[in-house]
Amino acid sequence: MTRPLLLLGALLLAACAGSPPPAAPAPAAAPSGPSCAAALARAGFVFEPAPDRDGPGDCRLRDAVRLSRSHVALDQPLLVSCPTAEHLLRFEADVVQPAAQRHFGQRLARIRHFGGYACRLRNGDTRAIRSEHALGQAIDIAGFDLADGTQITVARHWGEFGPRGAFLRQVAREACSIFHVVLTPRTDALHRSHLHLDIGRWRRCDA
């Protein structure tokens, strides 16, 4: 990946998840530990355990995995907590693949993302609360590639009236049944290029 794209991903992670959603706490996250890693292995995910991290500040990473491949290819490795990866597993199998078949008659081949774990506060603002990215509990999805090479990106296609826009909006709506918070271009300008999916304490669905 080129340096400009890496910088873009870093900036988007710094901007992600604006003010804390004023919603009721979400249910507990999926089980972690050996049972989580076993579920990923059974599903065919390619990953390796990642070391715990403490700090700086309130940042913390536990029971983490570095994914190099999920059910499909990833455009770059993804560092998240194992429970977050398990939610991604369900998201791909139960939401994205069926939506790709419905709108395009073919399978998903690749997920493009801007990252998972990042030690920072919301919006990169020192007055803000800790981001779920700082716990490895969030993923920023930039787009999807289909088996025939068709690319679908949030930045370009979210507002389209055709199948690519309909696909993205369906994926976002149905992600709300798996992830606790789903932020989209409907949320604010900071999310015009990606879907923020997290398993934090709060409930919010901006699909």
Model-derived features with residue positions:
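Bacterial N-terminal signal peptides that target proteins for export
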Residues: M1-L6
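Active-site acidic/histidine clusters and adjacent loop/turn architecture
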Residues: C36-I111
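Catalytic cores and adjacent binding grooves of peptidoglycan-active enzymes
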Residues: E48, P56-G57, R62-A64, S68, ...
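C-terminal motif of bacterial Sec signal peptides marking the signal peptidase cleavage site
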Residues: L12-A15
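N-terminal targeting peptides, primarily Sec-dependent signal peptides
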Residues: A23-A38, R42-A43
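Soluble non-cytosolic domains of exported or imported proteins
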Residues: P27-P34, C82-F91, G162-A166
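Bacterial signal peptide processing site
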Residues: A17-P20
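Active-site-adjacent substructure of cysteine-protease-like catalytic cores
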Residues: R102-G136
